[in-house]
Amino acid sequence: MSRGKIFECEVTVSYGVKEKLQTKHRIEIWEVEEVIYDDPHAFSISYKDCHFLYGQTFSGRYLLVLVRVLSSEEILKLGFMQGTKVLKIITARDMNSKQRKTYNKRKGTA
């Protein structure tokens, strides 16, 4: 488990993923951004080039966000400066009870 530089990044999301999050999971992109940028207790579990981000929105919603770290080539194709860390949102959903328990334990409120 890691905490740190992954949260100092830019975020990108495809139109299709954005639509799916809104219609299937009832999640807005700004909620995902709150988890990534604003939750001081957020943490990630890494698997290959993907990260499962555990976090909470200002309204108290517990979200599990799956992101992929983009390669240098992908970053340049999107028009970001070289060396910028960019996360591509793959999906997000509400945490289940076990995941909320893990989050709260890490946060120190379990």
Regions found by a protein language model. Give the residues of each.
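Ribonuclease/tRNase effector modules and their secretory precursors
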Residues: 1-110
